[in-house]
A protein has these predicted regions:
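Short amphipathic alpha-helix adjacent to the substrate-entry channel of hydrolases
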Residues: 1-11, 197
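Active-site nucleophile elbow and catalytic-triad environment of alpha/beta-hydrolase enzymes
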Residues: 145-168
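Catalytic nucleophile-loop/oxyanion-hole region of alpha/beta-hydrolase
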Residues: 15-52
C-alpha cells in the first residue's frame, strides 16, 4: 500500500531481533530511543524530509516514548507516529503477562530470550550468566537479572518506569495514533490511556473490540491487512493536512 502511493519504507529490527545477535553486551529494551533516533538520522541523511514512524508492541512503545521525550524539540522531518498493540505501562503489562491465563505466551517469550542470553553468556562470561535460567518464570525476574543491570537500570521496576511511554504521552507534539484492541491479552487496563488522549490535541486513541495483539487481519480483496490500511489512511491524512 505504501509503495503504491510512492512512499518508501524502512524496516528495522531491535538489536538481536533480526536473526543475528549483535556483538556488544547491550542488546534491546523498550526504552532504547537512542537506537530509533539513529535510524531516523540515517534516513534523513539519505535525503528523506518527511518521516512517519510506525511501530507495534514494544516498537510502538519505543516510537511514542521517542516522540514524548523529544516533545517540542522533535526534528521537523519527523511528521507523525502510528502505533498498534502498545504496552504503554510496562509494569502493568508485565504483570498481565505473568497471569496464569497467559502462561503459554510467557513461556514462549522466555524460551526465545534464553537463546539470546546463552549467546551473550558465551560472549561476555564476566557480565552474563545463563546458569539457573530455568528458574526465571516471568518478566520481572528476567528484567531484574538481565535487562536492568545490562542497560543501567536499578531493577525491573526502575526499567519499566523509565521506559514506559505513558508518562510522556502528554508531551507529544506531532500527530500520533495509538490503536489498542480491547481483547489484547497482553494489555492491562493501564495500557489504554483514555485520559491522556482526551487531554491531548496530538494523540488519538482507537480501541477496536477485536484485533488481539497485533492481529488486525481483516484481509481485503487486494490482500492488504486492516492494520496496513489504517497506517496508510492516517499518514495520507497527515500529508494532505
Amino acid at each position: 500500500d505504501a509503495n503504491a502511493k510512492g512512499w518508501d519504507a524502512l524496516a528495522w529490527n531491535f538489536r538481536s531481533c533480526s536473526g543475528e545477535m549483535n556483538k556488544t553486551l547491550r542488546f534491546y529494551h523498550s526504552g532504547a530511543t537512542d537506537d530509533l533516533e539513529r535510524v531516523i538520522e540515517h534516513a534523513h541523511q539519505l535525503g528523506y524530509q518527511s518521516i512517519h514512524l510506525v511501530g507495534f508492541s514494544m516498537g510502538g512503545n519505543l516510537s511514542l516514548l521517542y516522540a514524548g521525550r523529544k516533545g517540542r524539540d522533535i526534528p521537523v522531518h519527523v511528521k507523525s507516529v502510528c502505533v498498534f498493540s502498545v504496552p504503554c505501562d510496562l509494569a502493568a503489562s508485565s504483570k498481565r503477562l505473568a497471569e496464569r491465563k497467559n502462561k503459554i505466551f510467557m513461556w514462549r517469550f522466555l524460551k526465545d530470550l534464553r537463546v539470546k542470553i546463552e549467546v551473550k553468556a558465551l560472549d561476555f562470561p564476566q557480565q552474563v550468566s545463563a546458569e539457573d535460567y530455568h528458574k526465571i518464570k516471568n518478566f520481572q525476574q528476567f528484567d531484574d537479572r538481565y535487562t536492568a543491570p545490562i542497560h543501567g537500570f536499578d531493577d525491573a521496576a526502575d526499567y519499566w518506569e523509565k521506559s514506559s511511554c505513558k508518562p510522556v504521552l502528554k508531551d507529544i507534539r506531532i500527530p500520533a495514533l495509538l490503536v489498542n484492541a480491547e481483547n489484547d491479552p497482553f494489555l492491562a487496563p493501564e495500557c489504554f490511556p483514555y485520559e491522556e488522549a482526551k487531554a491531548s490535541e496530538w494523540l488519538t486513541l482507537e480501541v477496536p473490540k477485536s484485533g488481539g495483539h497485533v492481529g488486525f487481519i481483516d484481509i481485503n480483496c487486494d490482500n492488504s491487512y486492516w492494520m496496513e490500511r489504517r497506517v496508510v489512511d492516517f499518514v495520507t491524512a497527515i500529508i494532505k493536512g
